[in-house]
Structure formats: structure tokens, C-alpha cells
């Protein structure tokens, strides 16, 4: 069985890395003989962080070349591509409409040829199909249809759907893939509300729950050992932060208000006698355009006792982060996957909602009270919630352990079911 896993943006986002690692770990357990290739927009850093070979994404390279085309002709082509390219691809796939006879860029033709060497294509999960990210997100899927290969989308959150062209492509792609397996039910409700077809929808989990703890073969690096030692010295709460853009406008807030409010939460945690470690699931490795460490450093100016506020500047992979989060008492995460990684390594987590996916994931876990709307951060009420949670850790840990093991079991069944279907097609 030869599989291609595509759709990873970069493992520089350790959430995307955990999603990919969990899927790979599950496939390795369920079908150790499967031949699996992985593709990412940023293959060099992703390969290092995952500790396995990773191929570059040719469609991303093509898009970068097109976008950097010089001169008036280059700019005109860019505008035309942005407006019509996905309609042309869709016409090619459906073999209908006037646009079907227009030549597509060589990169698409080459990519279709590459896909034909696989038994099936898996579009790895995450929050990939979001209207704000635009229609290029559907290119891989349309090429898979052209290559006439099975396409399974595993562990996704989808939507919102507030753009007509995006919705048209979503309807076609989600209706023609072999399965769109959602990781939470809020996305399903959004699809129904926006009249997006749900015929191929199945309910699953986020594949980051499937990351193996690698208890037998994990060796802590110098940096990881340092942070494990720091966490062992005093009771520790971990936090993760982010630059809110592009969601700040939709949320009606500012980065400054968010940072000030989060500093208030950190100060309350320090008052409760804990130290705080700020970990970052997104760093600027390999030119990735988000670096949460800068937000963590910026927060320091508002912290009452900076000596007990530690910012991790090291480049850690998601598994190493899991080990450090596992040594903490609680995680308060703006990044959803810091919460998932934390809980997978047996540390309870509060996830701050700035998108529907966090509420959906916590709801599914049976811990809806652990997803806190960002409004509660901004109005200061999260401070008391965190203090209450710290007072209820033993009871919470028992519920968490049961919920995570249930989620992992569902996740393994989800991957098994996909592998069985691919085996039948093959």
C-alpha cells in the first residue's frame, strides 16, 4: 500500500506537526508495511522536526513563483490566476463549461502525474479549509480528482463559509472526496447552516490525539532536560500565546488588549504560588511567518514577578513539547494544539476559543467547560476560572484520563477504517 499524506503547511506549527505525527504513528501501528510519503510546504524544517524524510509541495512552489512574477504581464497574470485558476481546474475535473479547454499551468499537470503513483491520497487534518485562507486550499484535492485517485480527508475542522467562490469549491470537493472525516461537530453544523453538502461527512477525531508517547525510545535533548528540570523545581503552569491576526477583526479586539489580559491571568497564576513556562507551538523556523515567542517576550513587561515567568526560546518538536507539558500541572493555551498535546500527555488544559474548533474539540471530549471564549479572557473572568481549575486538579485529571483514552480509541478506529477502504480499492 503506497500512500501520500499532503496538506501539511509546516511542522514549524507544532500543532500541524502533532496532527501529522499522530496520523503517521497510527498508520505505523496499524499497517507497519505501508509505504508512506509525506509532503509539506516547508520540507527542510518539517523533516528535522518530524525526524523523517518529507517532500516539498510542488503546488506551493508554483504559487510562490507565480506570485513573484515581475513586470506588468506578471501582475496581470497573477490577477487572472487569482480570479479564474480554480474555476479552470474545476472545469477540467468536471469536464464542463467554457473554461475546460484553457491550458492549466505545467505544475498542475506534473502534480497529477506524481499522484498517479499512489494507491490513495490522504489530506491531513487541521483547520485547513477556512474561507479566510482562500480557494487555493482546494488545489491538491482537485488534482487528486484529475488523477482519479481516492481522496480521504482525515481529522478536519472546516468553515466558516462566507465567500461564494470558496463555498462553490467546498461543495464540489467535499461532495466528491471518498470521505471528509471531521474532528468535531461544530464544523458539521456550520456546513449544514451554509448549505455545504454533508453527504461524505464522517465523524472522527483530531489525529494529534494519536501521537505515541514513545516511552521506550525517547531521549531528552539538552534543552528538553533543562525545561524538565525547571518544571521539577516548583509547581508549574504552561501557557501558549499567539498573534491573533487574521482573527482579531472578526473577534473585535486588538493584540494589545489580548496581551494585557493574558498577563493578568499569568499574574493570578503567580499569586497562587505557581511558576509559568511560556511554550510556543509556532516559531519562525524556516521563514514561517508566525513566532509566538515574540508575543511571550512582549508579555513580560506586564508580569508582576518576571523571575518566575520563563519563555522557552528553543526550537522543540511537538513530541518534546508534549514531554514538557506533561511535567506541568495545567496548560492555558491560546493555540488549540498546545491544549491537545498537553492533554494527550496527561496534563489538563484550558483552551481559549478564538475559532469554533476549540469549543468543538472540548465538547467532544466531554469537557466543555475547559473551552473558554476569548471574551472571558478580555473581561478578566478567566483569572478566577484558572484559579478554580487549579483547586480541582485531582478530579479533573481522572475525567481527563478517561476522555483521552476514549478519543484515542475512536481515532485508531477512524484510521483503521480508512486503511481498510484503501486496501479494498487497491
Curated annotation (Swiss-Prot):
Pathway: Slime biogenesis; slime polysaccharide biosynthesis. Keywords: Lipopolysaccharide biosynthesis, Transferase. GO terms for biological process: colanic acid biosynthetic process; lipopolysaccharide biosynthetic process; slime layer polysaccharide biosynthetic process. Pfam families: PS_pyruv_trans. It comes from the Bacteria. InterPro entries: Colanic_acid_synth_WcaK, Polysacch_pyruvyl_Trfase. This is Colanic acid biosynthesis protein WcaK. It comes from Escherichia coli (strain K12).
Amino acid at each position: 500500500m503506497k500512500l501520500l499524506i499532503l496538506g501539511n503547511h509546516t511542522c514549524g506549527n507544532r500543532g500541524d506537526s502533532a496532527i501529522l505525527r499522530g496520523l503517521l504513528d497510527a498508520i505505523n501501528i496499524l499497517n507497519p508495511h505501508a509505504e508512506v510519503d509525506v509532503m509539506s510546504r516547508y520540507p527542510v524544517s518539517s523533516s528535522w522536526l518530524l525526524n523523517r524524510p518529507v517532500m516539498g509541495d510542488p503546488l506551493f512552489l508554483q504559487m510562490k513563483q507565480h506570485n513573484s512574477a515581475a513586470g506588468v504581464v506578471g501582475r496581470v497574470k497573477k490577477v487572472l490566476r487569482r480570479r479564474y485558476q480554480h474555476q479552470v481546474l474545476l472545469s477540467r475535473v468536471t469536464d464542463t463549461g467554457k473554461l475546460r479547454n484553457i491550458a492549466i499551468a505545467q505544475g498542475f499537470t506534473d502534480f497529477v502525474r506524481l499522484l498517479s503513483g499512489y494507491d490513495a491520497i490522504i489530506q491531513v487534518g487541521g483547520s485547513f479549509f477556512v474561507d479566510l485562507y482562500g480557494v487555493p486550499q482546494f488545489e491538491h484535492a482537485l488534482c487528486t480528482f484529475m488523477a482519479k485517485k481516492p481522496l480521504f480527508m482525515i481529522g478536519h475542522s472546516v468553515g466558516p463559509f462566507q465567500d461564494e467562490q470558496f463555498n462553490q469549491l467546498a461543495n464540489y470537493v467535499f461532495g466528491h472526496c471518498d470521505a471528509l472525516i471531521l474532528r468535531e461537530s461544530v464544523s458539521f453544523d456550520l456546513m449544514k447552516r451554509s448549505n455545504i453538502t454533508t453527504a461524505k461527512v464522517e465523524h472522527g477525531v483530531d489525529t494529534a490525539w494519536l501521537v505515541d508517547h514513545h516511552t521506550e525510545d525517547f531521549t531528552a535533548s539538552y534543552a528538553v532536560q533543562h525545561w524538565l528540570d525547571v518544571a521539577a523545581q516548583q509547581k508549574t503552569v504552561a501557557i501558549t500565546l499567539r498573534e491573533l491576526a487574521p482573527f482579531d477583526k472578526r473577534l473585535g479586539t486588538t493584540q494589545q488588549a489580548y496581551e494585557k489580559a493574558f498577563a493578568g491571568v499569568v499574574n493570578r497564576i503567580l499569586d497562587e504560588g505557581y511558576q509559568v513556562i511560556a511554550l510556543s507551538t509556532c516559531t519562525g523556523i524556516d521563514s514561517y511567518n508566525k513566532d509566538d515567542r515574540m508575543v511571550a517576550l512582549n508579555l513580560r513587561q506586564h508580569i508582576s514577578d518576571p523571575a518566575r515567568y520563563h519563555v522557552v526560546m528553543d526550537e522543540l518538536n511537538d513530541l518534546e513539547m508534549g514531554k514538557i507539558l506533561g511535567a506541568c500541572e495545567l496548560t492555558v493555551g491560546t493555540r488549540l494544539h498546545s491544549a491537545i498535546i498537553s492533554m494527550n500527555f496527561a496534563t489538563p488544559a484550558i483552551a481559549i476559543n478564538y475559532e469554533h474548533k476549540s469549543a468543538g474539540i472540548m465538547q467532544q471530549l466531554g469537557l466543555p467547560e475547559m473551552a473558554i471564549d476569548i471574551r472571558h479572557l478580555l473581561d478578566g473572568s478567566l483569572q478566577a476560572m484558572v484559579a478554580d481549575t487549579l483547586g480541582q486538579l485531582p478530579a479533573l485529571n481522572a475525567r481527563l484520563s478517561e476522555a483521552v483514552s476514549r478519543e484515542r480509541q475512536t481515532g485508531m478506529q477512524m484510521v483503521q477504517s480508512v486503511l481498510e477502504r484503501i486496501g479494498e480499492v487497491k
